[in-house]
Amino acid sequence: MDCKIVNNAGIDLRDMEQHIHGMYRHFDKQIGFKKPPVMVFDSDPGNATKTLGKTAYYDPQTFEVHVYVDGRHPKDMLRSIAHELIHHQQNLEGRLDVGGYHGEGYYLKNKGLQKLEQEAMSRGNELMREYEDQLKLKKENKMSIKDWKNKE
């Protein structure tokens, strides 16, 4: 099952959409989501001008992954999605409600949230790399077979 995409930003997602769904399917195969999230693409030009502005967030109440799109490379947006998909799984497992401080600088002040963030950073990047490498290997294999057939 693919995830729903909401394009509030009005950007052209044709090239990216196959990777959003493909990456989601790869993560689902590895993790086993009980419910798909909704991918929401948002525009915030003011945020885009900030060097350390927001890139994405996960809303555990609505199961939505929000991605800010302004001025970003598609692969960077996919990295944000990968990270937030891990938070989605953490939410489905009931692990996001750790209590403690949730305000500015929570990563430094809340060890429970810090551990969840570290998991999202490492596991999200790991699964995205697997997805990317599998696509590249599949493409190489198709090209090798084509070359082999052309030589006969």
What positions do the PLM features span?
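Surface-exposed helix-capping loop/turn segments at secondary-structure junctions
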Residues: 2, 29-35, 95-97, 131-139
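Short, contiguous pre-domain boundary segments
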Residues: 2-5, 98-105, 145
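Auxiliary, metal-adjacent structural segments of Zn-dependent hydrolase domains
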Residues: 2-61
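Short pre-active-site segment immediately N-terminal to the catalytic Zn-binding motif
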Residues: 64-81
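Post-HEXXH active-site segment of zinc metalloproteases
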Residues: 75-79, 91-122
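Short active-site segment of divalent metal-dependent hydrolases/proteases
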Residues: 82-90
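Long, well-structured alpha-helical subdomains associated
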Residues: 124-152
